[in-house]
Amino acid sequence: FRGTVVIGEGAVDEAPELYVGEELGTKQGVELDIAVDPLECTDSVANGRPNAIAVIATGTKGSLFQAPDMYMNKIACGPKAKGAIDLDASVKENLSRVAAKLGKSVPEMVVLVMDRPRHEALITQIRSAGARVRLITDGDVAGAIAPSLPDSGIDLLMGIGKSAEAVLAAVGIKCLGGELQVRLAPKDDVQKQVLRDMGITDIEKKLSIEDLAKGQDLTFTATGVIDGPLLKGVRYTSDYCVTHSVVMRVHSGTIRFLETQHQLK
């Protein structure tokens, strides 16, 4: 294959490897877009907190949204609540709609939110509506995918996070049949000009999962580093370590969970 990194570790002058625009593979065969985060949640790993993964998503050329390095407003739900979320609706309205789809009351709902000062008002609105909040310090990708996992205990993700993580999550959510809506949130005129330079003129457009990850030829692969809602972290014994991974494909709907032993000696 001939792959091009469309979401990676930064621009060519910011990262020695996996930089945006880097070509990977044999440079022959099918052309692919590659989105990669070799370690999502570096702070979590450094501080022993949960929810760290290594993740890569692929799609045919032109299928993955080439997200600029800025924030997005996000809302994500699982397959059973598909069609109920709306980024333009109020927090209370989204909670009521999703609860109705899931056959729950709003007080039974659990919403995942990143623990950031920018989310203080959002957290207040969720709790005022009667729902519960689950705070995470990091882990936007696994966090957005969590509502699509049947045993995660998470019904919704809400809040503001990085655009690169939104694209990675979009592929995973699409594999699982969930829904994600986002909107770019440039912080100043400089970032707005960056968007215009990229050809993005409708900054206020509500982007669907199909805008972020087009078509069916998409794959999502992740391995857990530290335990999180999606995967277990690495386990060590005296002779080997055990990793837990997931490999998903949109076209076939295949979801494979792998437990692998790696010999250390």
Predicted regions and their residues:
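Short acidic loop-to-helix transition motifs that present clustered carboxylates
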Residues: A11-D13, R118, T137-A144
